[in-house]
Amino acid sequence: VNCGQVNKALSSCVPFLTGFDTTPSLTCCAGVMELKRLAPTVKDKRIACECVKTAAARYPNIREDAASSLPYKCGVVINVPISKTTNCHEIN
């Protein structure tokens, strides 16, 4: 997995993550599902996590509550936290 793939998967989620939209779009949720598919191993999950943190840092107005609720709102169980503050090395 690389950051280009992660960024592409989650790019359509920015309106939801910044509070512009109240629910994630179908395209956004498809991206969350793609992120899950891209990161099957612990190593992949840690890399994806770092990519998410780097991408989130470019958007200072990302709402942490929206980010943490994104997988749940999309109905996707994913072991890659979507957060600016996650310690990615703690992912198992």
From Swiss-Prot:
Source organism superkingdom: Eukaryota
SS bonds (residue pairs): C3-C51, C13-C28, C29-C74, C49-C88
Pfam families: Tryp_alpha_amyl (PF00234)
GO BP, one annotated term: lipid transport
PROSITE patterns from the UniProt entry: PLANT_LTP
Cell membrane found in the keyword field: no
Matches recorded under InterPro entries: Bifun_inhib/LTP/seed_sf (IPR036312), Bifunc_inhib/LTP/seed_store (IPR016140), Plant_nsLTP (IPR000528)
Keywords: Disulfide bond, Lipid-binding, Transport
Family statement drawn from the similarity comment of this UniProt entry: Belongs to the plant LTP family.
Single GO term (MF): lipid binding
Function of the molecule: Plant non-specific lipid-transfer proteins transfer phospholipids as well as galactolipids across membranes. May play a role in wax or cutin deposition in the cell walls of expanding epidermal cells and certain secretory tissues.
Name of the protein in question: Non-specific lipid-transfer protein B
